[in-house]
Each structure stands twice: as structure tokens, then as C-alpha cells.
Amino acid sequence: LYTDSTHLKANANKRHYEQVEVEQTPAAYLAELDAAVDAERAAAGQRPLRRAQAAPAGPSDAGPTPEPGAHGAPAAPSEPTSEAAAADTRQIKRSTVDPEAGFMVRDQKPVGFFYLDHRTVDGVHALIVDTHVTPGNVNDATPYLERLDRARTRFDLKVGAVGLDAGYFTPWVCKGIVERGLYGVMGYRRPSHREGYFHKREYAYDPQTDSYRCPAGQIIVYRGTNRMGYREYASDPAQCRQCPQRARCTQSQNHQKRITRHLWQHFKEQIDAHRLTDLGKRLYAPRKETVERSFADAKELHGHRYARFRGLAKVQAQCLLSAACQNMKKIALLLARRAAALFSPKFWLCGALAGSLRSLYPLLTPRSPAGPSRYPAFPIV
């Protein structure tokens, strides 16, 4: 299955909006992340974190992002929330024309009020198996696992692999794919890097000692796990102060290098390793011919660039209707090709050749002296 999202311009002027305070709903995965953080800190002999109490978890408006710290804050196991993501509120732009549209701000994308159509297609015929609409300010990775499970159960699909772009490369999504026994292949996004400094990949991680080794050879040891789900590693300031490579490593006033590593980083590394294999390259290549082509046909032939209605439910109906039309056209074309193959000259030529071989088979079969052939003769067609 291949999944991606595209934006539909909402029927709302981007200049007609109001600034409102909305409560940040914690993401659904925070309860599981909190349990992992508590277990990690307990194993290291650290005290448990104090967390605020708030409403039950639900899909986050912003969703997780691939960069560290974008998951929001962890929550308590009983109430999946946290101090950083629970009781806090954030200010957003809400359209006065279509309040359910989301104000989208993305790199190399138009700015304004949009809806997002999250679409999943199969890798054989590019038939649409799921389409889901969210406001434009929702991250692509937020509804992915829920929609993947729905598509698999709704049509009883025997899915073996999934292909996604780099926007879905988050620890939570990678963990969900691995735990579902799927072979995930995701695109690559070059990480941000400050000119003149070492890349993070130059710091080698040793899983045996749970530590990093810097390019100068110093060991960066584990210091603790924060409430965001990141393990923190810190160097020895006494050694870094005299290091000749310190200018390329850190500019902190206490001469200490800090590195963070997510608790579920090994899931990301496992998924990222698939991208470099021959199987991963073959699986990822049809993505542009399936889900990307599906969006292209929808925009060119079905008016999928603009939301024709206002409100999330009506835009969802528009996307479902567009997906149904595309599926009916594709199924009709596939059935027509199959019917044409039955009446093609190649089909009848192969049939005539098979009939001739069946006719010649008794003549070429050796007969025993006793009389009839030892092999049954095929009827002449």
C-alpha cells in the first residue's frame, strides 16, 4: 500500500480570519511513550516525572514531526497527557468563512486555509482503498496508522509492505509499521546541519555500552531520559575544554557536548535500512506511478484542487465521490483489457496451436506390440 496526502484549497479567503486560543489535545501515542519513559527512568534509578492531568488523548492538530521534540510531551499512563502538551493552549488562525479549515504553512507549499486528503492506494492497480480528510494544519503522520488499520480490516487486505514519503518518518509510525509485521520503505530527507560543525552521524553509537563516541574519541555517556522520550547523553567538560576539535563540536559555555536519542530510534533505523536494499528500491519506485498519479488524475480530471463545499464533512464527501469515480473508471478499464485479451488474435492463435499439439500427441506416442497405446489418446479438437 502507498499513502500520501494532497491539499485542497478551502472555500475561504486567507485574509478573513481571527486569532483564537485552542486547547492542545495530546496525541494518542503519548500514553505508550509515557510508560516507556517511566520504565527507562526506573531502570536507571531516576525518580519518576511529575505530570499534569488533562483531558483524554485524541488526535493532535499538529501531529508528530520527524525532528526531535516534535512529538509533544509525554503523559501519565492513566491520563495520556503532559505538562507540555496537556493543559497548554496555543493560538491559531481560524477562518471566519470556514472555521473547520486549517491554516497550512509548509515549505514549498501555498499558504492559506486548506484541507488535506490522505489517500491510500494498492500497489498493483492503484485502486484507492482509503481516503480521509483533515484540516490543513494536521501532520501527515498523525492519522496514518489508524487509517492503515481501517483499510486492512475493511477489505481484508493481506498487506506485506507499505511505501511512504519522508513526512511519515517519525518514531511512532516506524514503531507501528514494525509491530504490524510490515516491510516499510520511506523516502529520505536530508537532516538540518550547521555549517562548520560535525554531523550527528559522525558520533558513533555503541548499543553495548549505551554511549556515543565523538570524532575525537571521547565517550559521551548516558545522563537521563526526558519527558519528551529522548535519552540525553553528555560529554565530560574537562576533556572537551582541551579538545582541539571543540570548535567543530560545541560552543556551549560549559564546554559540554549533548546528544539526544529517541527511545524508539531503533525502529527508525530499521525502517531506514530498508531504503538502501534492492527490495526497498523496487518497492518505493512505483510510488510515483500509483498514489502520485492518483492525485494527478484527481486534480486534472475531477477538480480536486479546490474544496467545492465548506465544512469537513462535506469536503470528505467530495473526496469520497472523487475516489469512487476514479475507482470505477479504473475497474472498467481493467475489465475491458481482460475482455479484449480473450478475443485477441494471439489468444486464438495459442488456442489453435494447443489443439494441434493435442491432435499430434497420439500419432507421436509409441504403441506396444500388444495393440493399443499405453497412453490415453487426447480427443482431436
What name fits each language-model region?
Residues 1-381:
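Anion-binding and metal-coordination hotspots
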